[in-house]
Amino acid sequence: MDEKLLKTIAESKYLVALTGAGVSAESGIPTFRGKDGLWNRYRPEELANPQAFAKDPEKVWKWYAWRMEKVFNAQPNKAHQAFAELERLGVLKCLITQNVDDLHERAGSRNVIHLHGSLRVVRCTSCNNSFEVESAPKIPPLPKCDKCGSLLRPGVVWFGEMLPPDVLDRAMREVERADVIIVAGTSAVVQPAASLPLIVKQRGGAIIEINPDETPLTPIADYSLRGKAGEVMDELVRHVRKALS
């Protein structure tokens, strides 16, 4: 393990992380853009946008119920556990994720920002009542709001929708404080998440990229570690723990 990399992490004043679908892929949750990605079997425009939901809510809900079932049955992997350990060590201050599962939290991470919402949450299309669910709904029937009776929808951000302003503001505040960012398992193409590491870089901070493949972020990353997030993060945290002891 690169000693300079370990020093960068151990001596960081405010380290944050940005994680994407590649982190949860090792838990059996399909990615969207990998070779075996979810979008290879389904057209995203058919399923993950407001128009598709308005046109055929049952079809969209069936797909999301299937995804929710996968998430609820999945277990955190070595990457999730490693990020939680970095937080326990006092090194990682905040974890920003593009993932809509709760595997970071179940691994023990506490300060997590979900940019794209969560499959654990459903919300009303009319009154905005939202609540957490413990299991995937059985479709049909379509789930209805217990307050106003309107149709419920998954609590995620769809294509064509804006990120909740408070969530994006919080993420921006975190990266503006950061002197190091670990970017793991993300294709670095989905905005505005892809711009977050650039803010750290522009402010003189370091980017540590972890990905099996090169991404648009690779040319400007200070460190690019090739491999699966679970394997790389597990080894990285073991070395960081030693460096801190």
UniProtKB/Swiss-Prot annotation:
The active site is at H116 (proton acceptor). Residues 1-243 form the Deacetylase sirtuin-type domain. Its main location: cytoplasm. Pfam families: SIR2. Its EC number is 2.3.1.286. It comes from Archaeoglobus fulgidus (strain ATCC 49558 / DSM 4304 / JCM 9628 / NBRC 100126 / VC-16). Zn(2+) binds at C124, C127, C145, C148. InterPro entries: DHS-like_NAD/FAD-binding_dom (IPR029035), NAD-dep_sirtuin_deacylases (IPR050134), Sirtuin (IPR003000), Sirtuin_cat_small_dom_sf (IPR026591), Sirtuin_class_III (IPR027546), Ssirtuin_cat_dom (IPR026590). This is NAD-dependent protein deacylase 1. NAD(+) binds at residues 20-39, 98-101, 185-187, 211-213, 229. The two SIR2 homologs in this organism, Af1 and Af2, display different substrate specificities in vitro. Af1 cannot deacetylate histones but does deacetylate BSA in a NAD-dependent manner. Changing H116 to D/N: Reduces activity 30-fold. Substrate binds at Y64, R67. GO terms for molecular function: histone deacetylase activity, NAD-dependent; NAD+ binding; protein-malonyllysine demalonylase activity; protein-succinyllysine desuccinylase activity; zinc ion binding. It is found in: Cytoplasm. One of its GO terms (cellular component) is cytoplasm. Keywords: Cytoplasm, Metal-binding, NAD, Transcription, Transcription regulation, Transferase, Zinc. NAD-dependent lysine deacetylase and desuccinylase that specifically removes acetyl and succinyl groups on target proteins. Modulates the activities of several proteins which are inactive in their acylated form. Deacetylates the N-terminal lysine residue of Alba, the major archaeal chromatin protein and that, in turn, increases Alba's DNA binding affinity, thereby repressing transcription. Signal peptide: none annotated. It catalyses: N(6)-acetyl-L-lysyl-[protein] + NAD(+) + H2O = 2''-O-acetyl-ADP-D-ribose + nicotinamide + L-lysyl-[protein]; N(6)-succinyl-L-lysyl-[protein] + NAD(+) + H2O = 2''-O-succinyl-ADP-D-ribose + nicotinamide + L-lysyl-[protein]. Belongs to the sirtuin family. Class III subfamily.
